[in-house]
Amino acid sequence: MIKIGIICPSEIAFRRFMPALRKAEKDIVFAGIGYASPEEWFGDTSKVSLEAIREQQERESSKAKTFIDAYGGKIYRGYHALIESEDVDAIYLPLPPALHFKWAKMALENGKHVFVEKPSTTCLADTDELIRIASEKGLALHENYMFVFHDQLKAIDDVVARGEIGDVRLYRISFGFPRRAQNDFRYNKALGGGALLDAGGYTLKYADYLLGETAKVVTAQINYIPEFEVEMYGSATMVNDEGVTAQLAFGMDNDYKCEVEIWGSLGTIKANRILTAPEGFVPRYTIKKNQDVEPHELPADDSFLKSILRFVECVGNENERITNYKVLIRQATLVSDFRNAYESSNNK
């Protein structure tokens, strides 16, 4: 039985991770949650008022208590305390992206398996370093792009494989959402914010899934809005060795869109919520041939649960761990390739 602890009482941990974890309790159970100590939160506390420290501790400990009240387990005062606990086998890490490398590295060095929210880190070198440590210590490292485990992806694959829309001419993947609160970490450069690492990562991963291992980023564009220090929207083109193209668009100051369009020689598939379908959501897609549109409905699924179960597989099986390392490095490489393509086009 794997005992997993959570670093940081975050919203996604309470709303999504814990309900899914409860369904997997025959394989993995909740051990407890750590909230940041003053030193972990502020760094040097010598210039921080006692009132600010007290408010931070009360706020974070109160959040942690909501987990314990609902699910049991133990509260750890400090991320270090959780990571160093002998009662914990694995760590779930839902911190902002810029903090992933530091705390995932520390967890791995302390012999803990790591289940990290996407992106694994903010750069290829850091992801590579985490994989090196995990591999040396025989530990699982899993990045939570849960959408790839949803049954709707295979269902749409099957429609294409049956030839219902003929030969694929183009994939178009779009993921964007309206502007969030100004203090959201996504808009904070120091915390690893930016549309590429957030919405953009989804589109790159799904395009790679559709195009296969020969897919390459050939063009990339990111765009800024004056009042923000991070990129707010962007686009890319990916092509595989067969010449099939995927056009990607993403943003976090956009009208909401989360869809794939697969344009074939005989028809077109469109599906919504392809990257973000929550538990209980009933996926729908359409097949359009000329002016005729056929609606289709698929069963609901729980991709977060499946992502947790994939992590469990990696904990228990070396071959699965190695496969997962390759998945992580591929995603980090695609993000790096995107950045290189953008920089290359802007340096001409």
Protein language model annotation of sequence segments:
Residues 2, 139, 166-169:
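Nucleotide donor/acceptor-binding cores
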Residues 46-62, 146, 263-333, 347-348:
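C-terminal glycine/acidic-rich active-site capping loop/insertion
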Residues 89-90, 96-97, 101-148:
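Beta-strand-loop-alpha-helix segment that lines the small-molecule cofactor/substrate pocket
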Residues 205-278, 308-319:
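Contiguous beta-strand/loop segments that form the cofactor/metal-binding neighborhood of enzyme cores
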Residues 1, 6-7, 27, 35, ...:
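C-terminal helix-rich "cap/oligomerization" subdomain common to oxidoreductases
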Residues 1-110, 314:
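N-terminal glycine-/serine-/threonine-rich beta1-alpha1-beta2 phosphate-ribose binding loop
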Residues 77, 116, 143, 219-222, ...:
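Short loop/edge segments at beta-strand edges and connector loops
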Residues 12, 147-219, 224-227:
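Predominantly a Rossmann-like dinucleotide-binding segment in NAD(P)-dependent oxidoreductases
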